[in-house]
Amino acid sequence: KSSEVLGSNNLHLKGTINNNTSSPTLNLVAEMREFDLAFAQEFVKGVFGNLRGKASGDLVISGTMSDINYSGDIAMEQLGLKLNFTGVDYSFDDTVISLSRGLAILNDVGVKDGRTNSKGSISGAIQFETLSSMGVNLVMRADNLMLLNTTQKDFDLFWGRIYGTGTLYVDGPVS
């Protein structure tokens, strides 16, 4: 069967779920055609805000319910998000992100903070076996990029605006 989620979001799920065994198996394809990423905001609200953009591509989902495997190349357009901890809202160049079992691979994706004289790029991997156990292994290169944009109301210990140029390595769990 094919169904649409939230009206015109253009997400079609096709395939089979075999629940005639003790561990149901999946053999599905999620077809996204300019799927509105704001749909996922509720799932990542602890880390990201203002999630936006469109996703297009096919995501193959297979395996048992306790061991789900997925893979696909997803084209991202007009992607943007706010890092809640830093208060900075970034927009990203259109790109293709490769997804496979627990990994999203970023390959030199351009990033901007909304000002005309800033730019950067990000490469690496985001690990997410489950949404509650995300991790990152990223390299971010910045040229006058905003890194912090908070007020004392946001964080009493440290706040303000910080702009930076250089290379930032981030590795570890997101919590």
Give a label for each model feature.
Residues 1-58, 66-167, 173-175:
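Interface amphipathic segments
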